[in-house]
Amino acid sequence: MFLLYEYDIFWAFLVISSVIPILAFIISGVLAPLSEGPEKLSSYESGIEPIGDAWVQFRIRYYMFALVFVVFDVETVFLYPWAMSFDVLGVSVFIEALIFVLILIVGSVYAWRKGALEWS
């Protein structure tokens, strides 16, 4: 039988974790001084006066490199718990992890062939 009271701790945690940030924003909005001026509107660069335009156009190469890094980072996050409990899980989970790794290898070969890993 499905009982809703089993999830009371989850709902309490969800409400508390939602109310605390909202309260922090409300309190900071009420208590913060409202002072606007040229110093508040300028960009902050480690206490140094900004030189030139604050907007710099990045090349798309940085984004592609970061995206490939995130893919391999997520792969590590998923494979670490599997590796820690490898002896308990069995052969079926090994095959699933192998399929997961093969899909990521195909993706990395595709990124390599497309030149996403080239930094020239």
UniProtKB/Swiss-Prot annotation:
UniProt-listed GO biological process terms: photosynthesis, light reaction
InterPro entries: NAD(P)H_OxRDtase_bac/plastid, NADH_UbQ/plastoQ_OxRdtase_su3, NDAH_ubi_oxred_su3_sf
Keywords on record: Chloroplast, Membrane, NAD, NADP, Plastid, Plastoquinone, Quinone, Thylakoid, Translocase, Transmembrane, Transmembrane helix, Transport
EC number: 7.1.1.-
Annotated transmembrane regions: 9-29, 64-84, 88-108
One term under GO cellular component: chloroplast thylakoid membrane
Enzymatic reactions: a plastoquinone + NADH + (n+1) H(+)(in) = a plastoquinol + NAD(+) + n H(+)(out); a plastoquinone + NADPH + (n+1) H(+)(in) = a plastoquinol + NADP(+) + n H(+)(out)
Topology within the bilayer: Multi-pass membrane protein
EC main group: translocase
Annotated compartments: Plastid, Chloroplast thylakoid membrane
Family matches, as PANTHER family: NADH-UBIQUINONE OXIDOREDUCTASE CHAIN 3
Job of this protein: NDH shuttles electrons from NAD(P)H:plastoquinone, via FMN and iron-sulfur (Fe-S) centers, to quinones in the photosynthetic chain and possibly in a chloroplast respiratory chain. The immediate electron acceptor for the enzyme in this species is believed to be plastoquinone. Couples the redox reaction to proton translocation, and thus conserves the redox energy in a proton gradient.
Quaternary data: NDH is composed of at least 16 different subunits, 5 of which are encoded in the nucleus.
Protein name: NAD(P)H-quinone oxidoreductase subunit 3, chloroplastic
Native species: Lemna minor
Lineage, uppermost ranks: Eukaryota, Viridiplantae, Streptophyta, Embryophyta, Tracheophyta
Gene encoding the protein: ndhC
